[in-house]
Amino acid sequence: MNRICHIEIDQASPIPPTAEIEQERQVAIFDLLEENSFALPPREGKPPVEGPFRLTLAIREGRLVFDIRSQEDEKVGEFHLSLGPFRQVVKDYFQICESYFEAVKRLPPSQIEAIDMARRGIHNEGARVLKERLEGKAEVDIDTARRLFTLICVLHWG
């Protein structure tokens, strides 16, 4: 079964996330564990490692780290992605989320909906960038990429 069965976010920041960010993290983890598609491609002529997988996401030395383990917690892979390609879309996502969180408190539903549509568009762009960066390292569907992108943003926020 090629899926993520457990996920951890290795946050090094001593500053706790805001209530909104913590809520985003919890929802993304719940949704990800409910339904996802995550597979490792074959390497060096060996057959692909089958899931389910335990995944830890971290930022170390300025790089996004995917630490992948078997369900029995044996290491099956690790790869590092440059954060450069994510910087602008993460920044844009931060800004639109701040606008959205403020809008929910004080604006009418029609204006909230417009901001939410923009937020979803930026979120989709982040998922697209992540899918591109994962090419040859891991295979994910767009919904899994969206949820992982949310967790990458949480790492930045934290």
Curated annotation (Swiss-Prot):
The protein, known as: UPF0262 protein Rsph17025_0594
Family per record: Belongs to the UPF0262 family.
Organism: Cereibacter sphaeroides (strain ATCC 17025 / ATH 2.4.3)
Source superkingdom: Bacteria
One Pfam family it belongs to: UPF0262
Listed InterPro entries: UCP032146
